[in-house]
Amino acid sequence: MKLVIMTKSTFFVEEDKILASLFDEGMDNLHLFKPGSSPMYSERLLTLLPKDFYKKITVHEHYYLNNEYRLGGIHIDNPADIAPKGFKGQLGRTCSDLSMLRQMKKESNYVFLKNIFDCMEFPEEKSNFNLNQLEDAAKAGLIDKKVYALGGMSLERIRIAKALGFGGVVICGDLWNRFDIHNQIDFKELIGHFQ
């Protein structure tokens, strides 16, 4: 099962150091997710990270960064959006509707099935599914190694995702809620949580 870390939706001081430490600890894939932000801030964050990690970074929005920095791919969050014309490379999508999942799997390398549980970072985003629906989707072959669980994922809930047959989990709120970006400067405890 793959572990994907998604950045906090806002930029903060020391973010580059925390991300570099997570890579040093073995993080396989980071999703640079800063919705509605200026691309210059994403560029700045990328320039602060060692180039060795670029192939492990997937970008949401500002898709040109994928080519400019030779990143690991792009991720499309809006189901209605299409890949940039002529795009070649790793492509991921986000889906929140089981009826669309089969088609999205055909059109991408992997799919984040969103709002498995209530979102920790955005409390207004509630779970889209109950356990019975997810079990039925797994039995129907919709949930497999190409589908990653997103939304409310924590270390405790990884077991549920694994039992359902998800190919990976996306951690966001469970990680970033353990660190006060405004007051803490020592992030060793945060890193230790995922060692």
Language-model segments: which ranges?
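CoA-thioester-processing core
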Residues: 126-140
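Short, conserved loop/helix-junction motifs that constitute active-site signature segments
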Residues: 24, 85-87, 141-142
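Glycine-rich phosphate-binding active-site loops on the catalytic face of alpha/beta enzymes
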Residues: 74-85, 110-125, 130, 158-194
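Catalytic cores of alpha/beta
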Residues: 18-21, 57-72, 76, 96-108, ...
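Residues at secondary-structure transition points
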Residues: 13, 40, 124-128
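Catalytic beta/alpha-barrel core
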Residues: 6-9, 18, 28-44, 48-103, ...
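Conserved strand-to-helix beginnings and helix N-cap segments that scaffold or border functional pockets
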Residues: 15-17, 42-43, 180-184
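Extreme N-terminal starter segment of soluble prokaryotic enzymes
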Residues: 1-3
